[in-house]
């Protein structure tokens, strides 16, 4: 198998962990006769230092042309890094949001598995830790608060911040379907977490989820 992998080393510990991940991929190539080529893509603080913005159109094009993208970490110390003297839309994390949107990466999969060797370090109740767990947590990435309108303004002499939470039925339906598809390969159980007793967006989420 031949693959071109976009490599985003990113910031902070990113270059270090990406270098180790590439060693693993290279070993996979050796063992299974695959061929991986790598294209470096700048994102976040590294892109700000090089180009003055957290993500360039060229970087988005490079990521889209890749078969997969390997990413380290994005951002730095908000107290000391000059990146955080910039307005929010030009900070490292803004580039990450742009990349998610540009690649349509709407579903974030986060497995949580408790291995026997780590049960003693688990902060959950012993009866839960003893049983162990194997969860797949899915988070929606391209809608909602992160991509809604936001503002901070003074109203009647008081600073007031606003963040708009918006989802449409198509955004909800596609991530619900992805959740169901994954569940069919596991234990065939899906739990949707919402706040439908208060939020309109959660009521729509529950309605579309049930209908899907």
Annotate each PLM feature.
Residues 37-41, 110, 191:
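General small-molecule cofactor/ligand-binding pocket signal
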Residues 6-23, 28-32, 157-210:
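Glycine-rich phosphate/diphosphate-binding loop of Rossmann-like nucleotide-binding domains
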Residues 33-57:
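N-terminal beta-loop-helix "entrance" segment that forms/cooperates
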Residues 1-12, 39-41:
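Generic N-terminal amphipathic, Lys/Arg-enriched alpha-helix
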Residues 46, 77-78, 198-200:
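Short, active-site-adjacent cap segments at secondary-structure transitions
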